[in-house]
Amino acid sequence: KLYQGRRYKFPVVVVGNLNVGGSGTTPTVISLANALKTKGLRPGVVSRGYGSSAHKYPVIVDKHTKYMECGDEPLLIQRRCACPVVVDPDRPSAIKTLINDFNCNVIISDDGMQHYKMHRDVEIAVFNEHINLGSFLMLPSGPLREPITRLRDVDYIISYGKLREEIKSML
């Protein structure tokens, strides 16, 4: 695996994608968190909080948090899952907060595939058939954050719609 990072006493599940723009990671995180809750687990979610205007971290997202403080996706996750959500660019720090302050026993990272300082036990890549992946070129020439071959390292691929044959052939 490509990443380093401290292992935690509870599993960390990273949900992410290779492309810029929305591919469905947030709905996947919401579904996963709710499924884990039905199994009696106590999930917590870490997020970078894109769009946040916070100047101090961590931001603990609750029903009183304004979207400007945390970004719209962490607020949506908290409202749909009623589980702890921590926004912090330093995701390992956010994980510690969830474990120590909220007694979470499984951590989900929204859009964390490219955050290599964070250990992960399970990695899920999400694709949406309506997102244009261009010619599979990386930024700045194309829409990919990493080479498409990075998918060989993930544990699961979730596709909203049909997974393109070109992607399947590269796995």
Label each PLM-derived region with a short phrase:
Residues 50-170:
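Phosphate/Mg2+-binding loops and adjacent switch elements
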Residues 2-63, 163, 167:
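Walker A (P-loop) phosphate-binding motif
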